[in-house]
Amino acid sequence: MARLFRASCLLSLLLAGFIPPSQGQEKSKTDCHAGVGGTIYEYGALTIDGEEYIPFKQYAGKYILFVNVASYUGLTGQYVELNALQEELEPFGLVILGFPCNQFGKQEPGENSEILATLKYVRPGGGFTPNFQLFEKGDVNGEKEQKFYTFLKNSCPPTSELLGSPDRLFWEPMKVHDIRWNFEKFLVGPDGIPIMRWYHRTTVNSVKMDILTYMRRRAVWEAKGK
């Protein structure tokens, strides 16, 4: 009886949004599906200043880390860690791409022209400038989601069974494979095929170790195949 009462209380708190909705339900990462149809090279996006459309095939032969970002999130500090990751793994072929999105708690409210200034002077602040490419703000879930995010999400299972508190999520319709929050990450391999997907709270250091492990494993596979 006590166990049932506790479960009932936890459910009430969950529905009220007082505890993290995915607590105990998330995985730090998931491996993407085998036999994915198509590649990321079929897509592209406009840079944050709107001046250049970059086809993702420009990154052929590289590892691409896709990150949906926000300037007023509790995880915005990951920007600093992502800069360090880009610098450290760029010699090994990693390219980080950032995609501002306002669908999670309305935490990216500014215009494209305001985002870089926010990062520089507010959060993370202190003159911060990302050393990786940012693209125009857009949707990653819902009716108007960017098509390459549809491809990524369909290629990789979600890292959490639950979406979260509906009053903080701003899109429709909601689907099981949707991105859960800001700073979720997808890794695409040198052949344009998605490899891994990370939960938004997985540390950037853990992401780095997963990427390095995969790079080493792939190098062994390719050496054996020659």
Curated annotation (Swiss-Prot):
Domain of life: Eukaryota
Family annotation (SUPFAM superfamilies): Thioredoxin-like (SSF52833)
Alphabetized UniProt keyword annotations: Oxidoreductase, Peroxidase, Secreted, Selenocysteine, Signal
GO BP: hydrogen peroxide catabolic process; response to oxidative stress
Signal peptide segment: 1-24
PROSITE patterns, A to Z: GLUTATHIONE_PEROXID_1 (PS00460), GLUTATHIONE_PEROXID_2 (PS00763), GLUTATHIONE_PEROXID_3 (PS51355)
Intracellular or extracellular location(s): Secreted
Enzyme class: oxidoreductase
Predominant location category: secreted
Family matches, as InterPro entries: Glutathione_peroxidase, GPX_AS, GPX_CS, Thioredoxin-like_sf
Catalytic-site annotation from UniProt: U73
Tissue localization of expression: Secreted in plasma.
EC nos: 1.11.1.9
Pfam families xrefs: GSHPx
GO cellular component terms, semicolon-separated: extracellular space
Subunit structure: Homotetramer.
Record PANTHER family: GLUTATHIONE PEROXIDASE, GLUTATHIONE PEROXIDASE 3
Function: Protects cells and enzymes from oxidative damage, by catalyzing the reduction of hydrogen peroxide, lipid peroxides and organic hydroperoxide, by glutathione.
Record's protein name: Glutathione peroxidase 3
Species for this entry: Bos taurus (Bovine)
